[in-house]
């Protein structure tokens, strides 16, 4: 996986966002071991301290659980993962709507475009 970061926010926050998406998309399964700080830091080409900050964010959100010397696991509480997904979906929709409003898109036109897109997508599957 190619990791890329921008200068708009802290790298640790960007990493937390990437890993959060990976968890809610099922790359890392509920109750299963999570890669170590060193493994992820190497993969992302970042300092282990930066990766540790990112994982602490996910622990504070309840997505990761530290098991002493055994490392971390993804929470087995699927409601925590589902809630994280819902929050991400809402944030995405808010951004899309805000961008549409800034382009002069009305609610009616927005809904029309969404429905048309889904119809095209359904016929292409």
Predicted feature residues:
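A short alpha-helical element within helix-turn-helix/winged-helix DNA-binding domains
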Residues: 33-44
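Residue cluster at the C-terminal edge of the helix-turn-helix DNA-binding motif
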Residues: 43, 60-63, 103, 120
């Amino acid at each position: 996986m190619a990791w890329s970061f921008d200068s708009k926010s802290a790298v640790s926050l960007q990493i937390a966002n990437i890993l959060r998406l990976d968890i809610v998309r099922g790359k890392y399964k509920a109750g299963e071991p999570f890669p170590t700080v060193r493994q992820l830091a190497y993969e992302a080409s970042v300092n282990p301290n930066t990766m540790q900050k990112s994982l602490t964010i996910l622990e504070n959100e309840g997505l990761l659980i530290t098991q002493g010397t055994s490392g971390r696991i993804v929470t087995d509480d699927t409601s925590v993962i589902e809630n994280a997904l819902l929050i991400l979906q809402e944030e995405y929709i808010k951004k899309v709507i805000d961008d549409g409003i800034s382009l002069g898109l009305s609610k009616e036109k927005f809904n029309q475009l969404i429905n048309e897109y889904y119809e095209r997508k359904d016929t292409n599957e």
